[in-house]
Amino acid sequence: MKNIHFKTCTCLLGILLILFSGIQVKGASLEVQQESKVSGTVTDEKGEPVIGASVVVVESKQGTITDIDGKFLVNVPKNGHLKVSYIGYETQEVAVKNRQLLKVILKEESTALNEVVVVGYGTMKRKEMTSAISHIGAKDLNQISSLDASMLLQGKVSSVSVSNTALADPNNQGSIQIRGVSSRNAGLGPLIVVNGVPGGDMTNINPADIESIDVLKDGAASAIYGTRGSNGVILINLKKGTKDGQVHTTYSTSVTFNKAKKELDIMNAEEYRAYRTVSNPLSDMGADSDWFDAVTQLGVTHMHTLTFSGGNARTNYRVTADYRNARGIDLRSDRREYGARANINHTTKDGLFTFSANITPRVIDRNKSANVYSNAIKNNPTMPIYDSESANGYYRFPSGTEGSNIVEQLNEEENGTEIKLLEWNATAAVNLLPLFNPKNPDMVLKSQVTISQYQVDKFNGWFTPSTYGSNVNDGVTGKASRDFDKSTTNNLEWVTNFSTRIKNHQIRAMVGYSYNYGVNSGMSAENWNFSSDGLTYNNLGSGLEAAKDGKTMMGSYKNDHKLISFFGRVNYDWKERYLFTFSLRHEGSSRFGENHKWGNFPAVSVGWRISDEKFMKGLSWIDDLKVRYDYGVTGNQEIGNYNSLATYRAFGWYQYNGNRFHVWGPSKNTNSELRWEKGHNQNVGLDFSLFSHKVTGSFNYFHRKQSDLLGDYSVPVPPNLFSTIYTNVGTLRNTGFELDVTVNAVRTKDFTYSFTLVGATNNNKFVSFSNDVYKGQKYYSTCSMANPNNPGYLQRIEEGERIGNYFTYRYAGVDKKGDWLIYDKKGNVIPVAQGTEEDKSVTGNGLPKFTGSMTHNFTYKNFDLSVALRGAAGFDIFNVHDFYFGLQSMTTNQLTTAYSKNAHITTGKNVITDYFIEPGDYLKIDNVTLGYTMNLNKKYVEKIRLFGTANNLYTFTKFTGVDPSTYEVNGLTPGTFGGGYNYYPSAFQFILGLQVSF
């Protein structure tokens, strides 16, 4: 179905053509035939006028286009015929039959080939595309309870990995990775473009405002964004106002319940006494505490959205206001936010100018928790939570005790953040056709300028009172801190588009200029030892700690960056059969060395619609078949603003000749040769539509090579001041296959069934770690595991190997004392104490080789049902909770596996071996949505929809730890928790919603 944004744009073009071109299709005059004037109106199936529709007299080839009200007037011979056409609609031929007034209703084309897809700085019909671009309409997006739009895409697009390791935490945000890891240390996330403005924030978008999302996955599509396109581009198209002259009001509300899943079998007090206190009777503190339950609650979220939309063909508007109150499943986490969005679009009466403006303010008040469940897991269950004799009523853990009273922390500690966001943009466009007065109705010449600003102000406050357990132990009468961070980004985009069709040739061209300037600033201050707890963090100056000699308990910063670009693109097609696209972006960034600030990012793509060839006409079951190839160069500049410059920092106070001096010096090795990280991308694709458009989809093979990777590299000292330098070293390669298929299996009057299958493979390899300047390093270790016992590194990134390799000892059993035995490099069994780094090897990989999903959609009369499955295969997970809490030698509380599955390991500590590596494959019943829609069409109520959604219902897996989808698979340490063991429990989620349209 056509999206509203496309209709708006094409209608606007129609208006401009009407008012300025004076177009008339010329043909041979039919003097011998008697003609009469025939007028009429062209509308769509909803009754809205179709502006700019072509109305051609079949016999004379003369014609016109419909005006702003969809009306037309033509001279037609007796018994003549009219051919009425418009982009995205089925062409109709109408017999006049001596009628003077006609009404023509155009139907949208049933095929997805004419679906409009947003590309960089423009739109295209799907059948014209020569790149790997995925389009998702609003109705196909996930039903979510948050304003984090990234979760809308989970499982919807092949090779788009959306990971959220704490879905029930209202303050956690998902991470997005497209076609695998693309860098060592530079940014890994895609560029977000909202309504054509680069640099958007997916957390500042109400899902109710989203019309569609387009994902640019390959280099040719994303190269138009140059240095910011290396990790792919996500284009979010927001809804605009209606044009039927009516005011439409929509109210939607939902309530979400999150119930934590207790996936770890933690010992209770009785089990703890039976197993642990035999060897250490003093560890029994006499209580019976369930720390997990004590910090867990039922998470409840309320969302309300009110939308007003209206206007006519010249002016339309849309205003949205929303409120969200979310409570997480732990005692502390909550989030309250208020937001709005206002959009207005106007075309002048003469059709020469078009103006549009958007403003999106949002205020967020949140409380975050840290390390809640790591403490809940490891705390001694015989340790009491409360103590009536303490100053604040909570039991104070003795100094040196493992863990902490996390219930006290959640209730007594203040740790809040207030965030104020303001995003606005304004666009002015001019139709340049009147300057040339063309006679070609297919010609467009339009120039537009967009200015925008995105500002984020963040205020953090933290306070622990004098009665707080750790403060009492440390003899501190309260601690407090305040932080303020401000980020402002300004954009200017000037784009001119031209298109024309000459017989069977269509040419489109675009040129543009972009200017981006960002400033980040902030300050922080802290103090201790207050005379009163009453003012919390609101009177830092009253603390006594900062007054001590030499104390520096405050700081500030400011930095900026600039990005300037010139870009262009040319599209050509012949009969929509042979397709060609070329683009180039010339871009300069202030973040790189003096001689390397500018870079060129070209792209070329070709397509061949084989189905239009004569030799394919006999294959009636093939509706459309297109092959395409593209190559594009992208860049990555997501690094620190001053990484290429010499920077200095304070090193404290030092004595010299009896005097104290504040000493400054270089903060890092300077690299004036720092330059772009480049991605060389190739893609071969096949788009198909079969069996009267019942089966549609695409198949892609991609090859992406990232060179001059940005990151830290080890260097000798001296001659260098520091042991690492931030530079361009290394090459990384990703290859894979993608399949996206939709099958419209059943379509009757009352019942429909369709399903969508999405799947992708990924083969990742780190090709090299050296270049002509920096040589010798073949690998670097990553994922340093947290204490106790200083376990070391879990993974290694190495030349010729995949990212995510576990580099560990190989488990060979235990000795008579219950300590680890391992295999050495020769295959001999030795005690773990004799093991060296040379005895370690690659024992698994945490990066999935295959990811996929399947969504089933059913409708029966007014009911609709959606069932989505999602999974991953071909990867391993390091069971961190078994590693830290599943061994008898650990001093914290343990999982029951320490005395069941791992009972034979009695003295062995947490040594990194492949014993803890398990297959991570899983298949998840991800979500089920059942809805009922009442189309009332009453005077005051147009439509009511009720729905219920259940998320995260069940996971099929052989993994013995927590939900495998809570392990991070994006980034450089897939299959782990990044070296720690803190996690946020998986939760069953149920959403109940109501939508009313007036």
Please report, for each region that a protein language model flagged, where it lies by residue.
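Extracellular/periplasmic, surface-exposed regions of secreted and cell-surface proteins
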Residues: L141, G189, R273, G299-H302, ...
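C-terminal extracellular loops and terminal segments
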Residues: S150-K156, T724-R733, K775-Y806, V842-T855, ...
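Short, small/polar-rich motifs associated with maturation and membrane association
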Residues: M1-R362, Y394-P398, V407, E423-W424, ...
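C-terminal beta-barrel architecture of Gram-negative outer-membrane proteins
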Residues: L865-I925
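Flexible glycine-rich, low-complexity coil/linker segments exposed to the extracellular/periplasmic environment
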Residues: K262-D293, T382-L410, L535-H561, G652-N669, ...
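Exposed, low-structure sequence patches enriched in small/polar residues
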Residues: G512, R569-D573, V758, N805-K816, ...
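Glycine-rich, aromatic-lined ligand/substrate-binding cores of catalytic
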Residues: N845-I877
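Short aromatic-centered micro-motifs
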Residues: V55, V84, I192, T500, ...
